[in-house]
Amino acid sequence: MQHPGHLIRLALSLPPHIALAKAARFARRLADRRIRGWLYRDRCSYPQSPGRLRRSLDALDVSIPDSFGETRLLFEHRFDLLGSGPVRVAHGERYKGFGPHRYGPSPPLPADWRDAVTAELSPGNRKRARTILDQIPGGYTPIDWHVDFVSGFRWSPATWGGGIAYAHLPGVDIKLPWELARMQHLPRLALLADAGTLPALAAEFRAQALDFMGSNPPGWGVNWACAMDVAIRAANLILAWELFRARGATFDEAFEDELAASLLAHGRHVMANLEWSERHRGNHYLADVCGLAAIAHALPDSPESAEWRSFATTELNAEILRQFTPDGANFEASTAYHRLSAEMAMVTAALLLGRGESLSDEALARLAAAVRFAAHVTKPSGEMVQIGDNDSGRFVRLETEDRPLDMAPLIAAAKGLFDLDLPVPADTLSVTRVVAALAGGRRFPAPPPVRRPLPTGPVENSPCLRLRIMPPAPAALTGLEAVAYPDFGLFLWRGPRAFIALRCGPIGQNGQGGHAHNDQLAVEIEIDGVAWTRDPGSFVYTADLAERDCYRSVMAHFAPRRGSGEPARLLAPFRLEDRAGAKLVRFGDDMVGRHVGFGSPVQRRVAIEDGAIVIEDTPGEGEHVLRSPEDLARLWGLILPFSPGYGRKG
């Protein structure tokens, strides 16, 4: 059922031509759902097994400690994803809801749950699905893979994946089932195992994989709606199987046949639904390529898998150079999406190189530069500066502890492939060892960074609003290193005790701005572990479009203001007007940037003078001395709760 009020609010937030285009796409999706569902409902979409899978990892003794009872939670099917909190995901559960919006629950399953699960599926898939589910031993409680386990809304598994509705009801977030079905918890099961628990954890991996395969026929349901998520799921299924085998676990032939058949279905689905665009392809297409690389090297050799191997290697080379700018930053104007895309490229590069494929020297140098960017945007507290959107997306999760604003797992992955003198926490050693094993021991030098000359032009000396930010310990502001990323639009002063960042540059995605915020000339400051001002994050996407725009607004950022006006229109939930045209004027002893988003030029200058951070906004008037983060927040009206990750506040 569509919710007219939610759809009307969405339409009214868009320019007429975009609203009409979206309405047309929505109508086509509804038609596609009905037509394909009718055409394919009596067909079986499961392929036959292509044969035994090929291994990339030999014996590997690597593990992570169970420091917070994660093993028990995974056995109980309790997941903490995208702000859900630890919640049991099962049929018939009632969930907390998103704000006032709460759906469900769906009916609980009877004792003979296999019949109930297969009865929901398209008729042509029921027989094969039942064969798969029958391989799961008694005592297992199935996961409900089709539910948003915050709002409680549930998608029908009998709906053709390409016609799945999303952003259609208030509070409903399709990212919840997608995140769970990425299966990033399954490699963790393998790493959590020790000699005594390995058989039980391997059995749980087998049961969950079969549960998913039997409950999600290829092409049907919410978990086949987005090729990116299909690709990431395949990579994690393969990695989990590899890690269990490398640690000594064995699996029966029937299961391995089903796993191989499922991976073949994943590969065919991704190839048939590549998220390619001449101008605006980004992390989704990169994920497609990386998932295909993993699938192609796991499947038995055949003309089909050979074609995928060649395609994935060629495209990974090309997309690294396209999606990472010459200074190493990702082109989507988001530090969180930089982490995701760099992690996908890094792990896949290791896999390909370990299997005898080649990447260009230029692509490898670009990856090494991407890791330096990750290190440089990390504040002394260990958290990355949030620029642009943050959906907490990852490719794999192999570290001991999940810290939502942590670049360390990416840096640790790179240390498995490159000779890098970058520190990482000890609890990320597992990441380095797995990536090094995937690379087959191949290592590469990290070329020195490329430094480009930056502008040193004159600044406008007109009346300005002047702020003096006075930290308790002025010495924290001494000895700062200046680091510039002009292609991304981020300029930094970094030291062991202080971090100051100025956002000034492109909105990303070749002007689409799909993951950018109205943050031009925004400043972020951390001193002695205290955030004096910081980007508030993103919170959510389609579950609450009004909240999304609040977090994208200039009013959420410590940036120059003109009343409550926006320097660029929020054209759509994933599109920002390319109007501000922010340009760096000078970077060195001070940082000066300018934009024209309000019609006439706005300039911001940042300097360190006499133990204080001085910020001057032109045009403007007045002077304020700020002695605490609270003073700054009150002056600028920064009231949005901080969101450290998707779906989280505070």
Give the location of each predicted region:
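Short, flexible loop/turn elements at secondary-structure junctions
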Residues: F149, Q184-P187, G495-R497, P506, ...
